[in-house]
């Protein structure tokens, strides 16, 4: 069978267009074969491919790319490639006319969030045609809704003679891509004139015509047995952009009458029911990966995962497991369940201990048979790459009583040679770790079932991908080459934390990751695709540059962006600032600073912690020269006076004007937020002005193009690794290059009215939100709406008058009717998604919401040791039965057009 591919693409000397055929082997692995195309004039490219092995009713997926001698090659959008169906019974030769496909503006409509949840239409099998001569039309129409089908109508009688009710129906052979084969013998003349129409399968009397002029194709001479394929430009219809509403709630925060003191995957199903019944379409959760390092409450931090693949055992729905045969044990577990479920907050340690014991009991009772099942064998085959190392890591962590593998007596790094023994059921090593296989199998089955259930209900499950991983976790243990362990990831100062955030995660070795095409990240995203149809990239700024903090620092103020372009002494002095290296890069400590920080304890501080150097200048004693040393010195001291003293010493240590580059000791970076510190205060006014210019150039201009290129090395591969809808958390110190990249890749931004991206306004204007965005009132890192309302009365008053357009004094606490008004305004915004926390939804009902608004806070970012234990005070069953609240939410959603 002869296949000829044609595409018009303007090139310059040195550029070549390549045809890339994508084939899938028996194991599901994709292999791409490249063919250099021929060229007549630098614009028209073609390639003739002979496929002896081609068979009827098969298809070929392919895309085009451009190879270039002097720059990176580029390729088409890969989320949906071209597809050629070999479905013509008499077809011996296919001639294809394609056009180049970049990322479309409406790429979100091709995401599984829309194709599998919102506009769900099952793809039919290939439909053969049996014409002697065939013209095939292929067109994309992503706007079509679930109940619509594309049809073509044209001038020839065989195409309906412009009677739309006699139009030829097309079929969807790929997501949002429709196809029809035409018999050339029934077409009139050499010019084919036609148009597309959307037919309502439920209401056939009101078809919808595509916009624009009639389409025309000048038909070539077509031989018997030839199929000429035209891929046409997208069909557009007068259909409004879809807007959807949703709820954000961590899985652990869910409460049902039958849960085990913490939300689980069974509760998640129940929450999907509530979301669906209130006409919402999105349910967003926080990360659900395993975080277990100490088996204590400090493991409650969901963003510190030990494995990017493994799910947390605490989310196992024990109700779905076979009942315990031991009646006494069963009764004991039930009594404990009722006790834990009655608690207002999560008791992380007791809950996890109880669930682990129950899982062990079920494993002893049922594990042998479950691990013989076909389902387990398939799961193991699909997951072996990460599952085997994870299981051994968990076994060794528990055996040695600590997760810090660098202190283990053996196995300080994963040994690939041990995989075979750990994968052989008859081996001793397998027996040691098979419990962890069992638990992950149970969790995977339950979460996949939740995902399928959400799709059936038309609800988009939205997950969360943390930017970091635990430095003592399995991922670092297994593949240390991908991580830098000589620093800590965090965030610069922002509205959440004046000292910045230190997450303690290792930073990524992007040079190593990019070498293999970011396979580690691609595997991560593809694994997440099993459970979700949309995801939030936590701290997307980390893909441009990460805030890297020295290992000996506690706060984030001494960090620097990595990678970034540091400044030489000569560059700094070129601005007009005489560079005093010792004074600017070492803590500047003088009498007046000590007095300002420590007041009446100044003399004590000088004696205990400082050495006098000259005049009124001091330096820290060697044993207190870093924040980590100070932290160790004050370990166990918890009085307010001791904490105040410790924090004062932290402030002295971070009192520098520049920090030295982490790789090049001759390069420097302006210290973040230095203008609020004493070393800046000590400068002459003229030097302050110069430093401000250096600071603004460095943070807002100098690195823009550099960071843009860094992000474009990584993000395109990741967002096109799956068909999930991509959303980003782009808050904080956002350089100009971030919206450039997000717009190129069509990533949804996050919009909060209380944290506007425009630095010139106090509150964002909801009507200015871009369509491609997620609108919310508060995130898990922020106070809830009710807390925010009472935090700062002056700010609230300004918001009440200027944004809600109400006169008089703002009422406190926030009344339900006013919370409803605020929620309604957010729902009316242009944003594609409006996802509100469950606490903010509950705020509209004074009878239902929690009396203590401060008990609703999920996380306080300024506190790295925060206990994540918030739990809904009302059960999902009660939410479902509360008719008034359910109808209230439904009315708000429907009035905003977000059904």
Feature-to-residue mapping (PLM):
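Structural beta-strand segments of beta-rich domains
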Residues: 1-5, 133-137
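Acidic/polar low-complexity flexible segments
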Residues: 80-83, 91-92, 228, 232
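Catalytic cores of glycan-processing enzymes that make or break glycosidic bonds
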Residues: 106-136, 183-186, 208-209, 216-899
């Amino acid at each position: 069978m002869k296949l000829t591919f044609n595409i018009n693409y303007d090139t310059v000397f040195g550029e070549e267009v390549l045809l890339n055929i994508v084939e899938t082997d028996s194991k599901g692995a994709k292999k791409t074969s490249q063919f250099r195309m021929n060229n007549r004039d630098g614009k028209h490219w073609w390639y003739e491919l002979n496929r002896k092995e081609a068979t009827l009713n098969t298809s070929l997926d392919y895309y085009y790319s451009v190879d270039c001698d002097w720059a990176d090659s580029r390729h088409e959008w890969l989320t949906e490639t071209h597809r050629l169906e070999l479905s013509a019974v008499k077809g011996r030769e296919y001639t294809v006319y394609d056009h180049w496909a970049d990322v479309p503006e409406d790429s979100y409509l091709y995401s599984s969030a829309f194709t599998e949840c919102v506009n769900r239409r099952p793809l039919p099998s290939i439909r053969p045609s049996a014409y002697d001569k065939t013209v095939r039309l292929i067109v994309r129409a992503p706007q079509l809704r679930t109940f619509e089908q594309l049809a073509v109508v044209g001038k020839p009688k065989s195409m309906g003679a412009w009677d739309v009710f006699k139009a030829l129906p097309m079929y969807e052979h790929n997501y949002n891509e429709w196809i029809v084969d035409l018999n050339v013998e029934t077409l009139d003349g050499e010019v084919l004139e036609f148009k597309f129409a959307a037919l309502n399968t439920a209401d056939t009397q009101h078809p919808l015509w595509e916009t624009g002029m009639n389409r025309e194709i000048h038909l070539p001479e077509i031989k018997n047995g030839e199929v000429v394929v035209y891929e046409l430009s997208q069909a557009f219809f007068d259909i409004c952009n879809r807007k959807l509403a949703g709820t954000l709630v961590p899985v652990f925060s869910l409460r049902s009458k039958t849960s085990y003191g913490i939300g689980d995957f069974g509760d998640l199903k129940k929450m999907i029911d509530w979301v669906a019944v209130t006409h919402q379409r999105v349910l967003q959760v926080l990360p659900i990966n395993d975080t277990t390092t100490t088996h204590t409450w400090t493991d409650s931090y969901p963003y510190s995962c030990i494995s990017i693949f493994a799910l947390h055992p605490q989310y196992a729905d024990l109700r779905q497991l076979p009942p315990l045969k031991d009646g006494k044990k069963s009764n004991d577990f039930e009594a404990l369940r009722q006790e834990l479920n009655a608690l207002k907050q999560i008791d992380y340690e007791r809950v996890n201990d109880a669930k682990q014991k129950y899982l062990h009991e079920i494993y002893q009772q049922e594990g042998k048979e479950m691990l013989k099942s076909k389902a387990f064998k398939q799961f193991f085959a699909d997951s072996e790459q990460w599952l085997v190392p994870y299981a051994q890591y968990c076994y060794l962590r528990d055996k040695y009583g600590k997760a810090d593998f660098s202190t283990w007596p053996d196995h300080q790094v994963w040994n690939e040679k041990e995989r075979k023994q750990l994968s052989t059921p008859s081996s001793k090593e397998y027996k040691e770790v098979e419990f962890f296989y069992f638990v992950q199998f149970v969790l995977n089955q339950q979460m996949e079932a939740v995902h399928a259930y959400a799709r059936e209900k038309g609800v988009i499950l939205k997950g969360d991908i943390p930017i970091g991983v635990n430095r003592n976790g399995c991922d670092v243990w297994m593949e240390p080459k991908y991580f830098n362990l000589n620093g800590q990831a965090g965030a610069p100062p922002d509205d959440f934390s004046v000292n910045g955030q230190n997450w303690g995660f290792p930073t990524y070795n992007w040079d190593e990751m990019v070498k293999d095409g970011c396979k580690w990240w691609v595997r991560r995203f593809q694994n997440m695709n099993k459970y979700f149809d949309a995801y939030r990239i936590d701290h997307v700024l980390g893909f441009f540059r990460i805030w890297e903090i020295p290992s000996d620092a506690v706060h984030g103020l001494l960090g620097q962006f990595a990678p970034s372009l540091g400044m030489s002494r000569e560059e700094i002095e070129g601005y007009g600032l005489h560079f005093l290296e010792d004074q600017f890069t070492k803590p500047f400590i003088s009498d007046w600073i000590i007095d300002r920080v420590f007041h009446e304890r100044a003399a004590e501080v000088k004696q205990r912690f400082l050495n006098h150097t000259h005049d009124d200048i001091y330096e820290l004693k060697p044993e207190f020269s870093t924040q980590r040393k100070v932290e160790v010195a004050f370990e166990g001291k918890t009085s307010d006076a001791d904490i105040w003293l410790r924090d004062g010493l932290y402030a002295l240590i971070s009192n520098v004007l520049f920090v030295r580059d982490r790789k090049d000791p001759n390069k420097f970076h302006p210290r973040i937020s230095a203008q609020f510190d004493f070393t800046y205060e000590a400068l002459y006014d003229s030097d302050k002005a110069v430093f401000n210019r250096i600071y603004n150039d460095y943070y807002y201009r100098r690195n823009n193009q550099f960071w843009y290129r860094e992000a474009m090395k990584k993000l395109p591969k990741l967002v096109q690794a799956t068909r999930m809808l991509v959303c980003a958390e782009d808050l904080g110190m956002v350089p100009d290059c971030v919206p450039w990249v997000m717009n190129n890749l069509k990533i949804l931004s996050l919009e909060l009215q209380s944290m506007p991206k425009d630095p010139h306004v106090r509150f964002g204007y909801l009507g200015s939100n871009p369509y491609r965005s997620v609108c919310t009132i508060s995130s898990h890192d922020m106070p809830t709406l009710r807390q925010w309302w009472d935090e700062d009365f002056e700010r609230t008053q300004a918001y009440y008058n200027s944004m809600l357009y109400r006169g008089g004094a703002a009422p406190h606490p926030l009344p339900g009717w006013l919370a409803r008004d605020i929620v309604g305004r957010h729902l009316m915004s242009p944003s594609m998604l409006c996802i509100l926390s469950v606490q903010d939804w509950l705020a509209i009902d004074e009878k239902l919401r929690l009396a203590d608004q401060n008990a609703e806070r999920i996380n306080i970012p300024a506190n790295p040791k925060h206990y994540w234990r918030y739990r809904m005070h009302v059960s999902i069953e009660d939410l479902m039965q509360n008719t008034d609240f359910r109808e209230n939410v439904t009315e708000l959603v429907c009035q905003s057009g977000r059904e």
